[in-house]
């Protein structure tokens, strides 16, 4: 694969309108070059560090900062070669003196700008030159790139480079030993397509390239698609304002004059790019109207207009032409539809709405809100209490209803319930006393009274069982008197223990 070189200016010191943010001090650049930091600087695409395509072989400072680099990435050159083979306009150059080289022309068309990435402040130990990028257009004035196969041919394109400076650049380039690894180029065709898409959104690209070409002193034929060299003083472009001097005179023209000369101005503006309408017609072999018979105007005849002025000229031209207006459909009047029932206003014809009687809205009295909370409270069941499960005694007036669920509605019912519980306890104690008195009376009438002790000193069944052990011998006699006395005593003891148990439970309940 043949060698591809690129050269150009990274900064032009003769320009007085340079921005301070992009200013490169001449003394700092010279010191960095003398210290050997100006060689083997990476060359990439649009400041993408993953798209390194070569290295810088020469960097020198004169009236400009001139650099020379070699494109060494084989994969990148293969992509450019395929793009150039697919393009139908890339080899259609007006300059027949240049040798046909689709790859070089493709590189000059896609990446005509240069940009140097350098250190601004920060750590002084970091390298001053970070990388050089080829791009769609550079920010610094005069930063335009020229690709070629021969370095002498590239340097001859710049009229501002003297013969002595050219010899120094050639000697520095030949003595430089370059190192490049193919792994540094990590992008593909989609990344390059995205860069081209971003470049197409730059509005001032072509005026900036025209100014850079004039400022760099490129006088001979090149592959750059940045229009012809500007020589007329009346058409000198101001980079900051991006408006020609003839624009001021155009603004003072009246609206009638603009309408008369609008077709000429429009055809003149369309010829500012390198590929004019005349060229496209000549390539395709056909045209509409009389456009094919009109010669392509020269660049000195071009007039640059602001966007607002151009749009106003288009509107004036469109208004002056006769237009066949399509008549609108006739509007037929519709009869009013009368119904025996009143309709809503939206269903009445628009023309009859003013005469339509709308009844006033009916006023409904406000209804008091329903007290839902009180209704829920009255139907809510109270929490169960211990009194619901207590034992009932015979003779109790609430004996049959004591197991039913109770509900309390307010505090008065709760107080009444507490009083009833106390009354029940008093009645139970009275019944226990009555039972004890009856038991004492029965015991006093028993014929075996002398064998019984008093109730107050009589031990319980548990104490009797503990105190008196069971007899070891059981008699099987049928003495009627003894069995009767034993059965009576056992019934008395069981009834007494039951009453005591109930009495203890009643006392425990009163304590709680």
Swiss-Prot record:
A motif (Nuclear localization signal) lies at residues 402-408. The keyword Phosphoprotein applies. Residues 492-512 are annotated as: Interaction with major capsid protein. The active site is at residues 47, 115, 131. One of its GO terms (cellular component) is host cell nucleus. Its EC number is 3.4.21.97. One of its GO terms (molecular function) is serine-type endopeptidase activity. It holds the Pfam family Peptidase_S21. Keywords: Host cytoplasm, Host nucleus, Hydrolase, Phosphoprotein, Protease, Serine protease, Viral capsid assembly, Viral release from host cell. One of its GO terms (biological process) is proteolysis. It comes from the Viruses. Residues 376-407 are annotated as: Disordered. The record marks 226-227, 476-477 as: Cleavage. It is an enzyme of class 3 (hydrolase). Residues 264-282 are annotated as: Interaction with pAP. The keyword Iron-sulfur does not apply. Region of interaction between pPR and pAP is called Amino conserved domain (ACD). The region of interaction with major capsid protein is called carboxyl conserved domain (CCD). Belongs to the herpesviridae capsid scaffolding protein family. This is Capsid scaffolding protein.
